[in-house]
Amino acid sequence: MSHEAAIVQTTNHLTMITLRTAKPSDIPQLVELLKELFTIEADFDFDEDKQARGLNLLLKSEKDCILVAELLSDNRVLGMCAVQTLISTAEGGAVGLLEDLIVAADFRHQGIGAKLLVEAVNWAECQGLKRLQLLADKNNLPALNFYQKQGWNSTQLVCLRKC
């Protein structure tokens, strides 16, 4: 992924961000974003060690990607999302699972999440992934509305899990 500078309009000023792939030194900031995300999602409990381990595994994987939105003025990571590669028999090839799309609360509603999502789609297309899918908390109406506005559609599938 090439670094892409973007300008987003905030309430009172312009914010310069760059979109890039995550690096190991980002992990503490990514863990903080996941802490914020997991307060919204009912199915997950925050555990700093587990989240750091998971992020490290994703960063080491050659077939997966973590994207970040970084504030250029102070190198603060404002947002993130991850794409993990899976094999789909329905598609006859690789597909992607988009996870952990989060923008820090103070920077929401400024287009950063949409830019991360577009970059994730671009990355998936470059990898030859045949489909992208995601799971969202059914009670997180702002997230569901956001994804629908970005052209994502609900399916008839229901997520089940066994711990």
Predicted regions, residues:
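Conserved GNAT acetyl-CoA-binding A-motif
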Residues: A124-L135
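Conserved acetyl-CoA-binding loop-helix of GNAT-fold acetyltransferases
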Residues: V103, H109-N122, K149
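Acetyl-CoA-dependent GNAT
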Residues: I17, T21-I27, E32-G93, E99, ...
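Residue-level recognition of the GNAT/N-acetyltransferase active site
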Residues: L86, A104, D137
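Conserved active-site alpha-helix within GNAT-family acetyltransferase domains
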Residues: R76, A114, K138-Q156, K162
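Conserved N-terminal entry element of GNAT/NAT acetyltransferase domains
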Residues: M1-S25
